[in-house]
Amino acid sequence: KYAGGNNAGVEYLDPKQEDFLVFINNDTIVSSDFLNHLINPFLSDPNCIITVPKILYAMDINKIWYAGGLINMWTGTIDHIGIRNYDAPRYSFLMETDYATGCCLCINTSDFKKLNYFDTNFNMYCEDVDLSIRAKKMNRKIVYSPKSIILHSVSQSLGENSFIKIKNKLTGQMKLFWKHASGLQI
């Protein structure tokens, strides 16, 4: 389980409060300078709480998998910006985004602890969106840093359209909206 495993890893490592944590999937390939570009937004904006890279498909490095994210509590949708589109200049600007994908995100240890880690009630899927919503409720920014680039071999663990993946995704989304949507939005 993503949430519990990452939480246990942080507890085991016991990093210093000022250290940065990078949570990254095992089916990714990073560029040589991705970490510098992932840290830079923290250095220039004290309201930055989480950063995320531009994520391209490993099988087609010209196509976007993630260039930021959008959450709509009214429609119950969680969308990656740019998904399956060819990379273009419009995906190359530093910007605030609604959520950070757990495929790769960076956060300061003290902030991760203030957020009380990943919520382990999410088995797989939406624990990253939940963390992002809680971060935004602290009036902090999640920043998409497009100069930080990684490649993602999508769904290598579960299969892109497997029943298990779809079931886990829907279960995570239901838990997420039940936890965060207002009575009018449900």
Predicted regions: what is each one?
Residues N72-D98:
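Short, flexible, basic/aromatic active-site loop/helix in glycosyltransferases
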Residues T28-Y66, L70-M73:
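Conserved donor NDP-sugar-binding/catalytic core segment of glycosyltransferases
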Residues D98-I149:
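A short, conserved alpha-helix in the catalytic core of glycosyltransferases
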Residues K136-I186:
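Active-site-adjacent helix/loop segment of glycosyltransferases
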Residues K1-P15:
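Glycine-rich, basic loop-to-helix element that forms the pyrophosphate-binding segment
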Residues F23, I50-K54, I81, S145-P146, ...:
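Short glycine/serine/threonine-enriched helix-capping/active-site loop
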Residues Q17-I29:
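Short beta-strand-to-loop acidic/aromatic patch adjacent to the donor-nucleotide binding site
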Residues K1, T28-V30, L56, N123, ...:
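A short, conserved beta-strand element in the Rossmann-like catalytic core
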